Each structure stands twice: as C-alpha cells, then as structure tokens.
Amino acid sequence: MYLQKINLKNKYALVTGAGKGLGRACSIALAEAGATVIALSRTSSDLNKLEKDIKKVKGKIIKVSCDVMNYEDLKQKLEKIKIIDVLVNNAGTNIPEPFEKIKQKSMNYLVDLNLKAAFNVAQLVVKKMLKNKKRPGSIINMSSQLGHVGMSGRNVYNMTKFGIEGLTKGMGVELAKKKYPS
C-alpha cells in the first residue's frame, strides 16, 4: 500500500463503515502505516474478520460495533474514545432506482446513512479534535464522482454525495478560521 511510506505510529484513525469495501481497505492501509485503527461497523462479524487481517499486518485495532445512523449510540461510543487523529468518514451505500420509482423508505435510508450520519460523525469528532490543540487532526469525508456529476438511476445517491461535497467545503472554510486542518 502507498500509506506504508507515511508514518502514523502513535496516531489513532477512526474509520466508519470499516467492515467492508473502501472502509475495510482504508483500515488495513492505515494499520500498515502504523495507526491504531478505531473501526466502526454495524456488523460484529465484519469487525472480527477485519481484526484478523489487521493482525496479519501487525496492526492495532479497536473494534466498535455501532450504527452511525443512531445518534445517541454513536455519541455514547465516541465519548469513550479519548484521541482521534484521523477521521475517514466512509460509511455509505447506494440503492439504485429510477427517479419515478424511488421509495421514500430508500430515500430516507440513503440520506440518513450517506449524509446525516457523515455530518454527525464529523461534528462529534471535530469537537474532540478541537479540544486537543497539541494533536491537530485530519478529516477525510468519502464522496464519489457522483458528487460532481449526475447519473441515471442514482438520483438519491447523487444528492447525498453532492451534500458531502458541500459539507466538506463548508467545514474546510469554517475550520480554517480556527487554524485547524479540514
């Protein structure tokens, strides 16, 4: 992995959606670079598999079973974590449906997971990062090419990823005023 050239020893990296896909790959790469990975996933079995793979690269992991869409659970779990140096805000999914057939349930789920949960995670982590002035952190909000261009059958996904782009830009402007990296 390319991150092996980056030294993240003694750093703590929180990854949402860590059990599968990009979140899993990021978690392993961060562990290879020396970070202690704080892996959030709804599925304990995915966290257990990730733990085995991180141990294979001699990495460290803190497993947190958590549904990022449940604000109170998320807040409670994050309160137990003392230091976060890196946030990889990755949890998300897509439910492809033609525009005229999009179900409210699907739309609400995608907005709750892809956008609202990302906002909530970022806000809670930034509060923690700002308290720790000696250890400025980095925030990576995972988006998609579909946060820049539209695609047929992906309208709600497009909407949430455009929202992530706006959130990230807004956070960058606001946090820069605090002389804090976004």
Functional labels for PLM-detected ranges:
Residues 12, 19-21:
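Conserved glycine-rich cofactor-binding loop
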Residues 35-49:
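Conserved glycine-rich Rossmann-like NAD(P)H-binding loop of the short-chain dehydrogenase/reductase
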Residues 98-99, 103-111:
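Substrate-binding pocket helix/loop in short-chain dehydrogenase/reductase
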Residues 102, 150-158, 170:
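Active-site loop-to-helix junction immediately N-terminal to the catalytic Tyr of the SDR YXXXK motif
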Residues 122, 160, 168:
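Active-site helix of classical SDR
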Residues 127, 173-177:
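Alpha-helical segment proximal to the catalytic Tyr-Lys
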